[in-house]
UniProtKB/Swiss-Prot annotation:
GO terms for molecular function: ATP binding; kinase activity; magnesium ion binding; potassium ion binding; pyruvate kinase activity. InterPro entries: Pyr_Knase, Pyrv/PenolPyrv_kinase-like_dom, Pyrv_kinase-like_dom_sf, Pyrv_Knase-like_insert_dom_sf, Pyrv_Knase_AS, Pyrv_Knase_brl, Pyrv_Knase_C, Pyrv_Knase_C_sf. This is Pyruvate kinase. NCBIfam families: PRK05826.1, PRK06354.1, pyruv_kin. Belongs to the pyruvate kinase family. It comes from Clostridium perfringens (strain 13 / Type A). Keywords: ATP-binding, Glycolysis, Kinase, Magnesium, Metal-binding, Nucleotide-binding, Potassium, Pyruvate, Transferase. ATP binds at N34, F35, S36, H37, R73, K155. Pathway: Carbohydrate degradation; glycolysis; pyruvate from D-glyceraldehyde 3-phosphate: step 5/5.
């Protein structure tokens, strides 16, 4: 059983019924829909198709809606693009929209001229093009082309080390979030989160439109977000290490260190952490990854990531199925060599909260699983809380969450090591233990004579009160 969760971005290469069904069978735990592209009508079709397929495949595949966020972009060019040479003068216009050419273009952030200073850098298209600001003339930013190339319509614009005043949630984002509530998606990925207040703004919109159960994944893509990561983790459900824009906004040599630090902080807080962007990037064009990409996926798992994500590889690449299968194979091999004791040791709190019974029980369960032959930990849960806390401590054996609610199953889709099954509501300890034995055999994780652990909270009518751990022989 694979423990590391996989998120596949759905796009032109993968939005057919055939590919989506194969993704689910390979082990797609969440389907990511990028709302920087497409309209509500096209996304509705995809969501309805995914919902139908996951029902047919009896899968708990979650749907993750990724909002565009306060991204600065270029506007249109004549013929869709223009060629720029090193040393050319080029103007970014913050005034009225103009049609771009090889001397100028408009950008979506109309106040950038107020924020940027001569000597500053502007990067376009994930840093492929670089400009140095010479002067600011009214609403025009006059630059020298440092690294030329082809500049195109609607490409991302980054301004490293310049705090921007764009709102955390744009009007388009608000509309997309409300649409997500209407479509009952499971997760929202909020782009360019810079401070905890940004997360709370997204939360307020979701809560006020029937989306209280939707979990928020905060995408960290700037130095400001990195600087505020501790406070962001406190208010978010999970974090995505979004290395694309991060690697443009922040010196590239810092990105691996930041990735490791964010993963560790999320692990310690028991929050979901996703490693994303360019994990198998060469598989957009080739049927096999580079050795460095295979190492990247493996090392993210060794660091403690809960989930790994494909972007262009699955959305627009030539080999979406091969990329998905390759990612799964690398994950399984990494897990077979994972040092679970190391991950557990670095989570131990030297000053534990004496009231944190659930944490104490979950830590003990993971510790016991590493020393005592245990095939699975079965967690009976109404809210997902018991299973999530067990996942925090990354036991060496699988966690089987049994719950009466499909929505809870999907809320656990991105937590490391959890598989889930819907079952009837439990009224007693005996019922839970009997069901635990049954599902462990059903998933072919345990056989007669094997040991499992059962974790639950009593009385069962109270949610979030994990207070029991029992070893049972099947």
């Amino acid at each position: 059983m694979q423990k590391t969760k996989m998120i596949f971005t759905i796009g032109p290469s993968s939005d057919s019924e055939e590919i989506l069904r194969e993704f689910i069978r390979i082990g797609m735990n969440a389907a990511r829909l990028n709302f920087s592209h497409g309209d509500h009508a096209s996304h509705k079709e995809k969501i309805e198709l995914i919902k139908r397929l996951r029902k047919e495949e009896k899968s708990a595949t979650a749907i993750l809606l990724d909002i565009k966020g306060p991204k600065i972009r270029t506007y249109n060019f004549k013929n869709g693009e223009a060629e720029l040479k090193n040393g050319d003068e080029f103007t970014f216009s913050c005034g009225d929209e103009i049609l771009g050419d090889n001397t100028k273009c408009s950008i979506s952030y109309k106040e950038l001229y107020e924020d940027i200073k001569p000597g500053g850098s502007i990067l376009v298209d994930d840093g492929l093009l670089e400009f140095k600001v010479k002067e600011v003339r009214g609403t025009d930013i006059i630059c020298e082309v440092i690294e030329g190339g082809t500049i195109k319509d609607h490409k991302g614009v980054n301004v490293p080390n310049v705090p921007i005043k764009l709102p955390a949630v744009t009007e388009k984002d608000r509309s997309d979030l409300i649409f997500g509530c209407e479509m009952e998606v499971d997760f929202v990925a909020a782009s360019f989160i810079r401070k905890p207040e940004d997360v709370l703004e997204v939360r307020e919109i979701l809560d006020s439109h029937g989306g209280k159960d939707i979990k928020i994944i905060s995408k960290i893509e700037s130095q400001e977000g990195v600087d505020n990561i501790k406070e962001i983790i406190k208010v978010t459900d999970g974090v995505m290490v979004a290395r694309g824009d991060m690697g443009v906004e922040i010196p590239i040599e810092n990105v691996p260190i930041i990735q490791k630090n964010i993963i560790k902080k999320c692990n310690q807080a028991g929050k979901i952490v996703i490693t994303a962007t360019q994990m198998l990037d060469s598989m957009i064009r080739n049927p096999r990854p580079t050795r460095a990409e295979a190492s990247d996926v493996c090392n993210a798992i060794f660091d403690g990531t809960d989930a790994i994500m494909l972007s262009g590889e699955s959305a627009s690449g030539s080999f979406p199925i091969e990329a998905a299968m390759t990612m799964s194979r690398i994950a399984k091999k990494a897990e077979a060599n994972l040092d679970y004791n190391y991950l557990l040791r670095r989570l131990k709190d030297p000053n534990p909260n004496p009231d944190a019974f659930a944490d104490a029980i979950s830590y003990s369960a993971s510790k016991t699983a590493s020393k005592f032959p245990t095939k699975a930990i079965v967690a009976a849960t109404q809210t997902g809380s018991t299973a999530k806390i067990l996942s925090k401590y990354k036991p060496s054996c699988p966690i089987i969450a049994i719950t009466p609610y499909e929505k809870v199953r999907r809320s656990l889709a991105l937590n490391f090591g959890i598989i889930s099954k819907k079952c009837a509501y439990f009224n007693s300890t005996d019922e839970i233990i009997e069901e635990a034995r049954k599902v462990a055999k059903e998933f072919e994780i345990a056989e007669t004579g094997d040991n499992i652990m059962v974790a639950a909270g009593f009385p069962t009518s109270i949610t979030g009160g994990t207070n029991m751990l029992k070893i049972e022989k099947i």
